[in-house]
């Protein structure tokens, strides 16, 4: 189900010069890490060649891959977005995520959009100082937000009506938008 994460990130990145997206798809083989290495090859040829030399990423070479990726240097700004990362997370060793989070700051920005980080959740949470998180509570709309959106759309909602919209939508922006487009009618969310 779409909760508005991708839309929120897409809007936030409007005007950013170089943004490249990878979208994971359920029930299809994950190629996100291979795509990531190819994108790095556009920015840091040396790292690309070093990663190519270790071939397919697995547990036996994850520490080596982490050391290589920790040395990545990107001069010009580039943002790589991994959408639906929950479909790829199991294929990314924790040491790789850790190395990427601890890299020296440069032009490389990584965004992982996921409904669930699975076994990588503790790895991401341990990086709290070096990783920016948008959690559910950061995306959910409040009654005041919903009343404000309704006013922008020329509607007038009472606090009770806004409460009903939250009850029916969970406060997720995409669902709230659809509800307001239907004059505040709400159905049950799956």
Where do the protein language model's features map onto the residues?
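Conserved nucleotide-binding/hydrolysis micro-motifs of P-loop NTPases
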Residues: 2, 26-29, 116-120, 139
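Amphipathic alpha-helical "lid/sensor" segments that cap RecA-like P-loop NTPase cores
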Residues: 129-133, 148-190
